[in-house]
A protein has these predicted regions:
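Hydrophobic faces of well-ordered beta-strands that scaffold small-molecule active sites
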Residues: 64-70, 97-99, 132-136, 178-180, ...
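Noncatalytic carbohydrate-binding groove/subsite architecture in carbohydrate-active enzymes
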Residues: 61, 79, 161, 195-316, ...
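Boundary/entry segment of secreted carbohydrate-active catalytic domains
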Residues: 52-95, 100
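C-terminal region of N-terminal signal peptides and the immediate post-cleavage residues
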Residues: 8-38, 44-66, 166
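N-terminal export and membrane-targeting signals
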Residues: 1-3
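Substrate-binding cleft and catalytic face of glycoside hydrolase catalytic domains
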Residues: 89-233, 263, 348
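Short, acidic/polar
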Residues: 76-90, 159-167, 234-246, 318-325
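Aromatic-rich peripheral "rim/lid" segments of glycoside hydrolase catalytic domains that contact
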Residues: 114, 133, 170, 179, ...
């Protein structure tokens, strides 16, 4: 599930151009069940040669929790593969995971909840002390409505709110935070043309149910993908967030979430299309709406290797991930960062979707694996 996105425009694009140009953003697939294998640990010290200077990292004023966002496929794995994935996350040093909790999967038949997949995964994360962010979304076919022209209509708010409340009550001791929908600013995930007003109405229906089921729940809104404003297809994070703040009272959420993909650029870059750079604009919108207290959670960040037109080199992937952690650490307004992803979704080097992992599909380590392990080891030593 869930969506990683690419650089929007060519280098040198102006702000005005960035807001007008069509987006070419498609989320990576998340339904592949990886095969088991044994990890290797090949890497070099050059893996992080292009990251932020070490002196900047040492001067950081706070520690940012790091997790993985592995997509829904982790729930479809064998128990052996699931355990190996979680053990490898802990070996790297991450303490958090973003898990998909799909309404369509849980309530595939109307009125009948099947929690077996999520029960199994959450039992394993709990045994390892991994803290869970659950992203809830994905409407079942039986709940999807269409207009007279056959166009999909917005999410069934009442049905989704019931599901969210049931999930929060069931997992109140196992899930620490709840993210409402995944990349609702893209038609690909919203299904109907994306619309901030419709999303805000969903948040206002769901948040009280989450808090009723789990009074200690932390609620995240946004989950925004890199995008530009393209009518009927995508809404830029800035436009989308303004629409959310105009309609959602602050009591209904605790943090904003975004997916600040920057590849092929570094997260420290100043390109106008760079979503890591655009977070500054999101922060300004939050402050303008009296919400300087809230953090921005980075619930997906990564870069694909392989041979596709959008791929980066394996050493560059390592540098981008480490630099992303350091840059998040340097800013005073970020919450946890979740890396997409632990393991490649497939084996086609030419398919961008298959190559976001720090491990290959058969569990051989890319340079990013050891680079992250070193970085997080230093982080623990500083704390």
């Amino acid at each position: 599930m869930a969506a990683m996105c690419v650089a929007l425009l060519a280098y040198g694009t102006t702000t005005a151009q960035a807001d007008a140009a069509p987006a070419t953003l498609v989320a990576p697939a998340r339904s592949t069940t990886p095969a088991a294998a044994t990890p290797t640990t090949a890497t070099t010290a050059a893996a992080v040669s292009r990251t932020a200077p070490a002196s900047r990292a040492r001067s950081a004023v706070k520690r940012v929790p790091v997790g993985f966002s592995p997509g829904f496929s982790i729930q479809e794995e064998s128990l052996e593969d699931l355990r190996r994935d979680l053990d490898q996350m802990r070996a790297i040093g991450v303490t958090r995971i973003r898990l998909d909790l799909s309404w369509a999967r849980v309530e595939g038949v109307r009125g009948r909840y099947d929690w077996s997949q999520s029960d199994r995964v959450l039992a394993e994360t709990r045994r390892r002390g991994i803290r869970v962010l659950a992203v809830i979304g994905y409407q079942p076919d039986w709940a999807q409505r269409y207009d007279s022209a056959g166009r999909p209509q917005p999410v069934d708010r009442a049905g989704f709110a019931r599901f969210a409340g049931a999930a929060a009550a069931r997992y109140r001791t196992q899930v620490g935070a709840w993210e409402i929908w995944n990349e609702p600013n893209l038609q690909r995930f919203w299904i109907a043309p994306p619309n901030a007003a419709q999303y805000a109405a969903l948040v206002n229906a769901v948040a009280p149910r989450l808090r009723a089921g789990d009074p200690g729940a932390r609620v995240l809104v946004g989950s925004m993908s890199p995008a530009n404003d393209v009518a009927g297809e995508t809404v830029s994070p800035m436009t989308f967030l303004r629409g959310v703040y105009a309609r959602v009272p602050l009591r209904n959420f605790d943090a904003v979430s975004v997916h600040p993909y920057s590849f092929p650029a570094m997260p420290t870059g100043f390109e106008e299309w760079n979503t890591f750079f655009r977070m500054r604009q999101l922060r300004q919108i939050m402050a303008a709406n009296g919400d300087a207290r809230s953090k921005i959670w980075l619930t997906e960040y990564g870069a694909p290797t392989g041979t596709s037109d959008e791929a980066v080199g394996e050493q560059d992937q390592a540098a981008m991930l480490v630099s992303g952690i350091r840059e998040a650490r340097r800013r005073g307004y970020t919450g946890p960062i979740y890396l997409y992803s632990l393991r490649d979704a497939g084996t086609d080097a030419g398919d961008r979707e298959d190559n976001f992992g720090v491990l290959t599909h058969d569990r051989h380590a890319k340079p990013a694996y050891a680079a992250l392990r070193r970085e997080l080891s230093r982080d623990r030593a500083r704390s």
